[in-house]
Amino acid sequence: MSKVFKKTSSNGKLSIYLGKRDFVDHVDTVEPIDGVVLVDPEYLKCRKLFVMLTCAFRYGRDDLEVIGLTFRKDLYVQTLQVVPAESSSPQGPLTVLQERLLHKLGDNAYPFTLQMVTNLPCSVTLQPGPEDAGKPCGIDFEVKSFCAENPEETVSKRDYVRLVVRKVQFAPPEAGPGPSAQTIRRFLLSAQPLQLQAWMDREVHYHGEPISVNVSINNCTNKVIKKIKISVDQITDVVLYSLDKYTKTVFIQEFTETVAANSSFSQSFAVTPILAASCQKRGLALDGKLKHEDTNLASSTIIRPGMDKELLGILVSYKVRVNLMVSCGGILGDLTASDVGVELPLVLIHPKPSHEAASSEDIVIEEFTRKGEEESQKAVEAEGDEGS
């Protein structure tokens, strides 16, 4: 059974059908956006039917645009004339889903295929604060369809249909070795140093899974290690319009294991950074959020060698920090404790899903309709022809 996403314009004359809303960036290639647009022939008449793909970077509030300030920059716009079809842009082979939709929807349905370029950023949303209004900042993609004499013509909101999609990356097929780091700290009045080593078994980890952090301590000093603290930081670089950098802690936990003077310690700790623990943090980077759908922490940005980082708009990375609180003793006790730490790079991303071909010719349509200012959705099973 094939699932299809449908969105209809406010005037009811145009509908877009897409087989999915997440399109995978394989670093060197990007999945094409293939779908079908259904149009009322009386509404189309002698005009042209267009489908447009836009990648935009939004970095300000909607309400400020009313006073002439624009906080949106279109990074990429691709316009395809669907009706009448242009000979310079011939339609390639239809996908199985397009063939099924054309058979179901009738003669007023037209296929389209949009191809993203490889140097575009992935979908990222910066989480707004409780007082923020309007659309959140970030990178978003949308597919839009409208009827006009030319693509530059101004079209009213009720006369076009648009559907937000996401560009996502999955874990690379070949991951590198697990990162490791170590440090040596010497203390006054201690002949031998304190050695801390931390490592992870693999470089790439998936959203929601426990991350195993291995810690080895060789404490040859006369100091006592009172506790071990492990944290995960998300680093977001906004490189398109400024050099802003935001660091948000998405996981932190203190472990009460103590390491006595002149002793050794080795243990593996499980840490799991998830959005639920940081859901109120303003500016936290999330995977581009589609309305009505849960999201998660933004995936690490994977960059093709030689790629211009500035074109990506927002770069996301993670690091694991392991810190030891070393008691210096004396009458002040823990007030004079020293901090010894190391950092490990972390790649946090989604696993590559397994694609299973749909064996049934049935199509389930998930339709998005507008209710007031909110959008709601309903799943509708299409049994028979629709929209002609």
From Swiss-Prot:
Presence of the UniProt keyword Disulfide bond in the record: yes
Keyword Repeat (UniProt): no
GO BP annotations listed: G protein-coupled receptor internalization; signal transduction; visual perception
Entries under InterPro entries matching the protein: Arrestin, Arrestin-like_C, Arrestin-like_N, Arrestin_C-like, Arrestin_CS, Arrestin_N, Ig_E-set
Key words, A-Z: Cell projection, Disease variant, Disulfide bond, Sensory transduction, Vision
Cellular component GO terms, alphabetical: cytoplasm; photoreceptor inner segment; photoreceptor outer segment; synapse
Main location as per UniProt: other
Superkingdom of this protein's organism: Eukaryota
Entry-linked SMART domains: Arrestin_C
Subcellular location: Photoreceptor inner segment; Cell projection, Cilium, Photoreceptor outer segment
Gene Ontology terms, MF aspect: G protein-coupled receptor binding; opsin binding; phosphoprotein binding
Tissue localization of expression: Inner and outer segments, and the inner plexiform regions of the retina.
Database matches in Gene3D superfamilies: 2.60.40.640, 2.60.40.840
Ranges annotated as spanning the membrane: none
Function recorded in the entry: May play a role in an as yet undefined retina-specific signal transduction. Could bind to photoactivated-phosphorylated red/green opsins.
PANTHER family cross-referenced by the UniProt entry: ARRESTIN (PTHR11792), ARRESTIN-C (PTHR11792:SF19)
Family named by the database record: Belongs to the arrestin family.
Disease: Myopia 26, X-linked, female-limited: A form of myopia, a refractive error of the eye, in which parallel rays from a distant object come to focus in front of the retina, vision being better for near objects than for far. MYP26 is characterized by typical tigroid fundus changes commonly seen in early onset high myopia, and an unusual pattern of X-linked female-limited inheritance.
Subunit details: Homodimer; disulfide-linked in response to retinal illumination. Interacts with CXCR4; the interaction is dependent on the C-terminal phosphorylation of CXCR4 and modulates the calcium ion mobilization activity of CXCR4. Interacts with GPR84.
Protein name as catalogued: Arrestin-C
Highest classification ranks of the organism: Eukaryota, Metazoa, Chordata, Craniata, Vertebrata
Underlying gene: ARR3
